[in-house]
C-alpha cells in the first residue's frame, strides 16, 4: 500500500514534458508545474511557432511575469529522492528510477526498462520488446557462446600444460649442456678457461632469456585461462538467474564472448638453437696457440674518412655502415629506391698505413648478411667501373679480402683465371659456424694475410700467401648493402 501511494505521489511531481521528477519546478496560473529547463525550452518553441505562450498540458495562456517557483513541490521531490523504497519496491523486477515493473527490453541499450523509461528522452525512438519475447532468443545465443568458451577453455588448459612441459624440458636440456661444456673444457683447462667461461655465460644468458620468456608466457596463459573461466562463470550465473539478470547487459557479454581469442605462447624450436660441440681437442689446442700468438700483435684500428667512399662512419671512427638508398624520381612522378655504387664505393680504409711488421685486428660483423673485409693497398680511382660484379676485389688490384653475402655464403676473392683475368676467382669457404667476429692478421715480411673465425674458437677461415706488398697497405672494410654496421673492436674488448 505504502509503495503504491509513493508511486502516485511520484506521478504528481513528474514533469509532463520530460517525464522525470521535477527539477527546479515552476508553476503556471492553471496550476500545472514543469521543470524550469523544460518550460523555458517550450516557451521558446511556442514563441517561434505561434507567437503566444500557453500551458503545454491544458493550452491555457499565461504571462511570464506570473510564473512562480513551486517550493512546495520542490520539497516533495527532494524528500522523494531521499526516501528509500520499501522491500517490495526494491525487487529486481522494478525500475530503480520510476518504481514501475521492468517489462520491456531496449535493443539499443541492451537492458530491461519500464514503460516510463520507454517514454523518456533517454529511450525515445529506441526499439523495445516485451522481455518474454526476447528472453529465449538471447538464451540460445548465450548457450552457443558458452559451448564455444568451454572448447577454448580446454585449449587454454592444454596450452598451459604444454608451456609448463616445454619450460621443464628447456631447463633440463640447458643443464645438460652446461655439464657437457664443463667436461669438455676440463681437458684444456690451462688455456681454455676464458672460452669455458664465455660458453657458460652464453648458456646462462640463453637459459635466463628463454626461461624468462617462457615464464612470461606461462603467466599469460594462466591469466588467459582465468579470464575465460571468469567469463564462463558470469554466463553460467546469468543462465541460472532470473530473466532480468539474463538480459541485463546481455549484448555486451555476448560481444565479449565472441571476441575471446586465445593467444598462443611464444616457443623456441630446439632444432634452431646453437648447440655447443667440442672440436678436436688437439686441433683446438693448436688453433688456440696460433690465435694467442697473433693476438700479441693486436693494434687499435680506426677508419679514415675520404671523398671516394659513400660509407657512413660513426663519431668514434669504429663503425661503418651502408648509406640510405637514394630516391630516384622517374617519369610521371614515379619514384624508386636504389643503392648507387653500392659495392666498391661503400668501402673504407683504416687510418693506419702499414709498411712493415705484424699487425692484428678484429671486426664485429654480427647480424650482418653481407660484408667484405681484409687488407687493401689503397683505392684505385680508375677501377671504379663494373663495380656490381666485384671485379676490383683481386690481389692483382691490391685487395686481399674475404666476404659474406646472403647471410651464409662466405668467400675469398683471388685473381682471375688465365682465360678471364678481369673477373675474380671466387673461392667458396666452408665455415661450420658463420662468423660474428673475424680476426685479421697481416704479416708484412712473410707476405701473408690470415682470417680467423673468433666465433668458432678462432679457427682459420682463409689465408692469402705470397702477397705482393709493393706499397703501403691498409685495413679495409665494406658494409655492402646491409645497413647493419660493422665495428672495429678495440684490443680491450
From Swiss-Prot:
Subcellular localization: Cytoplasm; Nucleus
Pathway: Protein modification; protein ubiquitination
Gene, per the UniProt record: TRIM5
Modification sites for Phosphoserine: 86
Superkingdom field: Eukaryota
Span of zinc fingers (B box-type): 90-132
Catalytic reaction(s) noted: S-ubiquitinyl-[E2 ubiquitin-conjugating enzyme]-L-cysteine + [acceptor protein]-L-lysine = [E2 ubiquitin-conjugating enzyme]-L-cysteine + N(6)-ubiquitinyl-[acceptor protein]-L-lysine
Annotated family: Belongs to the TRIM/RBCC family.
Segments forming RING-type zinc fingers: 15-59
Nucleotide-binding listed as a keyword: no
UniProt note: domains: The B box-type zinc finger domain and the coiled-coil domain contribute to the higher and low order multimerization respectively which is essential for restriction activity. The coiled coil domain is important for higher order multimerization by promoting the initial dimerization.
Source organism per UniProt: Pongo pygmaeus
Record's protein name: Tripartite motif-containing protein 5
Main location: cytoplasm
Binding site for Zn(2+): 95, 98, 117, 123
B30.2/SPRY domain boundaries: 281-493
Entry EC no(s): 2.3.2.27
